Amino acid sequence: MVKLRWMNGEYMKSMDFDKFYEMAEPYIREVIKKNLDLRKIAAMVKTRIEVFPDIAGHIDFFEELPEYDPQMYVHKKMKSTEETSLKVLKDVLPILEAQEDFSNDALYERLSAYISETGVKTGFVMWPIRTAVSGKQMTPAGATEIMEVLGKEESLERIRKGIELLEK
């Protein structure tokens, strides 16, 4: 059974995107009721699932931010703690509030500039942002890709909630 799932996953990875989307869309619509770009969400999960029912567990956070433990901000490899994550989120919030173009590329470029200015590693900044906007440790995409799909207002609201959670 494990090998069959793996083979199916390989088949899905090689599948033409339009065909994949046509087959995945009903599974995505079961979870996502908001007006989000479902094609972008499908592209995120295409290489990460083995069977279509797996989609729900990968994308549920787009519909609603789950409750999560502030310990999720702690990541040994990224060298992030609750304290450093709080500082990063407080630093990037006004930057993102001022950001007009909320496309993945523009967000990544702006956050990369912040990373260069502060002299920290990319993961040190992106880990807390991704945690705040998704409420998960594992996501089908990075922080800026997720924010592009969520949009500016929802992304900022989730970052504010992350700050509140870390300040408790």
Region spans (language model):
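Small-residue-rich helix-loop
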Residues: 17-118
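Non-catalytic terminal extensions that flank enzyme cores
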Residues: 1-33, 145-168
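Non-catalytic, well-ordered alpha-helical scaffold segments
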Residues: 1-5, 18, 39, 43, ...
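Core structural elements
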Residues: 1-10, 50, 120, 131-136
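Charged substrate- and nucleic-acid-binding regions of tRNA-handling and nucleotidyl-transfer enzymes
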Residues: 104-167
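Short helix-capping/linker segments at secondary-structure and domain boundaries
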Residues: 13-17, 53-56, 135-142
